[in-house]
Amino acid sequence: MKEKTFICILALCCLLGGCGAAHKAPTGNPPFREGRQLTVWSAYWDCQESVTVIDRCTDRISAVSLFAAYFRDGALFLPEETQETLRALRRSDAGDPKPIYLSVVNDVTEGEKTIQKDTEILRSVLSPHQAEGHARELVALAKEYGFDGIEIDYEKLREDPDLWEQFLSFEEILLSLAQEAGLKVRIILEPGIPVKTLSFPQGAAYVVMCYNLHGIGTEPGPKADLAFLRALYDRFAGLPNLSFALANGGFDWEEASGKAVSLTEKDAAALAEAHQVLPRRDAASGALSFSYTQDSTRHTVWYADSETLALWAAELDACAGKTVPISIWRVD
């Protein structure tokens, strides 16, 4: 565990431009720029390691988003692990406090059953007669536990005009209540939404997910490539207070079935080492890939490392003509 944590700290600090002379990022890897606004996600299942990494790289991190509150048996639920991460971060950053957001997702758990990205719960809580109550509940939850902001990560709205109308009305209410309570608001946006037909209000930070070019249900490939990033920037450039979310790690595709399994960067590197293969860096994306055979079945792996993320961030900077805010999924 100690070795794993050290590797994670070193990789993130290199990514953020915080490596000392003894631990420089690879040659040609543009570090994340000084002065970049950088938010990192911490997931509730990685509490202890996340706190260690964030604490070691605290001077490079602008904000933290704790993933996540969700719906359990019809009510908002905040995992104890998320609460403990918040307490630990507050203890460690007492001399340098940074905003900590409560991330809220539309995952639903009922008994032993879990539905991820459930749109039915959204149709309920965003409906005209429940939207204000839902917004008040979110603000109360964030204030109760001492968060500095609320992050709305409601997904799979896709091109449903009625659901988007409800969401935007809810957002207006949330922004008003959050402002009264002294809370910040971040809105996470999937890359495929019909952004050109939607009128998002001022007051929130808008974060575009830039990491689902390939994944579960697709052919093997990187989470993003440079052309994908340029296209996303062009589509979303008109939004106010815009930033971009990048993700490390990747997927392992089983060629016979097409099934994909998510991998962290460390998992992918360990898999390559175990099968004695050397990953190759793709020029179009900066991502790493390799293939291996196990139990007579061919597998293909694509994943992003710190050099990949730095390249993606630099491409977005070039599109914007400035250093853009970046969020990273996730500290692992």
Which residues fall in each region the model found?
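Active-site groove signature of glycoside hydrolases
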Residues: 134-165, 206-212
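Substrate-binding surface in catalytic domains of secreted glycosidases
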Residues: 41-43, 73-81, 160, 164-274
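An active-site-proximal structural segment forming one wall of the substrate-binding cleft
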Residues: 123-150, 177, 190-192, 196-199
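Glycan-recognition patch characteristic of GH18 chitinases/ENGases
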Residues: 23-134
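Catalytic domains of carbohydrate-active enzymes, especially glycoside hydrolases
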Residues: 48-74, 138-150, 312-327
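Hydrophobic faces of well-ordered beta-strands that scaffold small-molecule active sites
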Residues: 38-42, 62-66, 100-104, 150-152, ...
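Glycan-binding loop/region signatures in secreted carbohydrate-active enzymes
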Residues: 109-121, 248-312
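C-terminal motif of bacterial Sec signal peptides marking the signal peptidase cleavage site
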Residues: 16-18
